[in-house]
């Protein structure tokens, strides 16, 4: 099994509703470790660059607006098969389709405000981590 790193973002709805500890508990119980974490307020430019893959999608403007509406927590998680493991504990993108016992199944109600982001591939994990963290910040 491969030890991987993945990016996690606890979105503004998570920070606003003060459930950061709840989400971190799900992460830690899954066997993943948080090796870097910081709170930040994304600028419009940062959000547009980070989500550039979606720039031609109808939800792009709303996504950028939401992701800049309040602080986020960006994290780097590490562990065996971290990317697929974190995606599994996040649950389906649409909380209505997410299983109970997943972050979105237990804490989210809306596909547009679904609490968390996680990298979807090893290649994207490398890019996304480098977007927010210098290598020296990863302990």
UniProtKB/Swiss-Prot annotation:
ATP binds at residues 11, 59, 87, 93, 104, 114. Gene3D superfamilies: Nucleoside diphosphate kinase-like domain. SMART domains: NDK (SM00562). The keyword Transmembrane does not apply. GO terms for biological process: CTP biosynthetic process; GTP biosynthetic process; UTP biosynthetic process. Keywords: ATP-binding, Cytoplasm, Kinase, Magnesium, Metal-binding, Nucleotide metabolism, Nucleotide-binding, Phosphoprotein, Transferase. It is an enzyme of class 2 (transferase). It is found in: Cytoplasm. This is Nucleoside diphosphate kinase. It comes from Wolbachia sp. subsp. Brugia malayi (strain TRS).
């Amino acid at each position: 099994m491969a030890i991987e790193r993945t990016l996690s973002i606890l979105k503004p709805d998570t920070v606003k509703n003060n459930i950061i500890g709840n989400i971190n508990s799900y992460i830690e119980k899954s066997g993943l470790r948080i090796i870097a974490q910081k709170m930040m307020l994304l600028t419009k430019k940062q959000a547009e660059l980070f989500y550039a893959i979606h720039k031609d999608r109808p939800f792009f403007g709303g996504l950028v607006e939401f992701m800049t509406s309040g602080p986020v927590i960006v994290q780097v998680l590490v562990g065996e098969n971290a990317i697929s493991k974190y995606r599994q504990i996040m649950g389906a993108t649409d909380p209505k389709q997410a299983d109970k016992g997943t972050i979105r199944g237990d804490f989210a109600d809306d596909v547009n405000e679904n609490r968390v982001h996680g990298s979807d591939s090893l290649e994207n994990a490398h890019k996304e981590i480098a977007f927010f963290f210098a290598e020296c910040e990863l302990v």
